[in-house]
Amino acid sequence: MNIVILAAGMGKRMYSDLPKVLHPVAGRPMLAHVLDTARALSPSRLVVVVGHGAARVREAVAADDVAFAEQAQQLGTGHAVMQALPLLDDNQPTLVLYGDVPLTSAATLQALVAEAGAQRFGVLTVEMPDPTGYGRIVRDAAGSIVRIVEQKDATEAEKAIREINTGIIVCPTGHLRKWLSTLRNDNAQGEYYLTDTVERAVADGVETVSAQPAAVWETLGVNSKLQLAEVERIHQGNQARRLLEAGVTLLDPARIDVRGELTCGRDVTIDVGCVFEGRVHLEDGVRIGAHCVIRNSTVGAGAQVHPFCHIDEAKVGPAGRIGPYARLRPGTELGEDVHIGNFVEVKNAQVAAHSKANHLAYVGDATVGSRVNIGAGTITCNYDGVNKHRTVIEDDVFIGSDTQLVAPVTVRRGATLGAGTTLTKEAPADKLTLSRAKQLTIDAWQRPVKQPKQ
């Protein structure tokens, strides 16, 4: 099967320099969602018709399995499909999709393709409570589709029809090539309508059939930021429903955003306002507090992530305690029962089991052993202005508050660093190491007093 995706429109009502099909739904361009659905049908040829912002669209979706055709002038949907004809295989039917209709399911498209087979003309239709603005499906007395009439060209009787054309069609490619060559633009829009091919099919004796989606929202197109927001909420509602049906507890299903793939074990609880990006896996018994952002990460069984944490390309071990207000940056790997507390940032560091950094610390480019206590205000000074250097902290180390570890440096097993230490050399095992300026008291000192204003 050939699949053609129309993605040439300007999207004037978006009021944006970004091509319409690149506006995101769930953090990904609408066109990327349509391509994913198209690939699920295993097409032999996949063609994207580009126009406005063609270079940006090509760059955004470039892939070995995608060919591009360019519609230099936007003269209608029929004209757009004409541009793809040289890239299509006449021996297989062609399915036409739209880059700004991101929620259509593969199951719905498979039903349409099955209904049409190899020789019939298939149209995806849906009944709308308010069909204003959509092309109407006109049927004869026997119920057969005879044509599709656009809103601006419809009579009052035709405007009363509630069954509308979604724009998604499938038909024999050889016939499509012939029908497109006969299209005219003598209509209110001055465009070449793809929908006019239905009348050509009827005239040529090609049976026209229809299929319907499981839900109306599958066929919603996006032409404005308002419609984009509506589609986003529908998609997020679908994601929330999937999680609930899988046994996840969502404290408010209307306040979760999944911008990628979220998988969960048993007895997972997610509080309000959380955002999940990329691939995220939450193991059994995980609890995620309110307003966390988690991206491309794994959270181990029984771990608790308290409110307002950011976790990016990191691994949290089983029974971990994160936050509130903690930040785990890429390359962070935490072992079992590791505690990362409020206003602690960890980057490109491996922290072994039962270690803790509970307050106000930066642990970057470090290897931290087991049962280590990192005191409040501890900083690994990893950057010399050109290169990053590593800090190694071995098992059972105790680091006092307000300590700076100037990398590269190693703290040996069982060492204790006194509060306020600036460590520039190796700290030996099982000893107290500290560096501290001599404390002075100046007896004759007086605090300055502000002079009264003149």
UniProtKB/Swiss-Prot annotation:
Binding site for UDP-N-acetyl-alpha-D-glucosamine: 6-9, 20, 71, 76-77, 98-100, 135, 150, 165, 223, 329, 347, 362, 373
HAMAP family attached to this UniProt entry: GlmU
Function statement: Catalyzes the last two sequential reactions in the de novo biosynthetic pathway for UDP-N-acetylglucosamine (UDP-GlcNAc). The C-terminal domain catalyzes the transfer of acetyl group from acetyl coenzyme A to glucosamine-1-phosphate (GlcN-1-P) to produce N-acetylglucosamine-1-phosphate (GlcNAc-1-P), which is converted into UDP-GlcNAc by the transfer of uridine 5-monophosphate (from uridine 5-triphosphate), a reaction catalyzed by the N-terminal domain.
Subunit relationships: Homotrimer.
The protein, known as: Bifunctional protein GlmU
UniProt pathway annotation: Nucleotide-sugar biosynthesis; UDP-N-acetyl-alpha-D-glucosamine biosynthesis; N-acetyl-alpha-D-glucosamine 1-phosphate from alpha-D-glucosamine 6-phosphate (route II): step 2/2; Nucleotide-sugar biosynthesis; UDP-N-acetyl-alpha-D-glucosamine biosynthesis; UDP-N-acetyl-alpha-D-glucosamine from N-acetyl-alpha-D-glucosamine 1-phosphate: step 1/1; Bacterial outer membrane biogenesis; LPS lipid A biosynthesis
Gene (UniProt): glmU
Region called Pyrophosphorylase, residue ranges: 1-225
Assigned GO CC terms: cytoplasm; membrane
Entry's EC annotation: 2.7.7.23, 2.3.1.157
Cofactor(s) this protein requires: Mg(2+)
Residue span of region N-acetyltransferase: 247-454
Family: In the N-terminal section; belongs to the N-acetylglucosamine-1-phosphate uridyltransferase family.
SUPFAM superfamilies the record matches: Nucleotide-diphospho-sugar transferases, Trimeric LpxA-like enzymes
Reactions performed catalytically: alpha-D-glucosamine 1-phosphate + acetyl-CoA = N-acetyl-alpha-D-glucosamine 1-phosphate + CoA + H(+); N-acetyl-alpha-D-glucosamine 1-phosphate + UTP + H(+) = UDP-N-acetyl-alpha-D-glucosamine + diphosphate
Keywords (A to Z) from UniProt: Acyltransferase, Cell shape, Cell wall biogenesis/degradation, Cytoplasm, Magnesium, Metal-binding, Multifunctional enzyme, Nucleotidyltransferase, Peptidoglycan synthesis, Repeat, Transferase
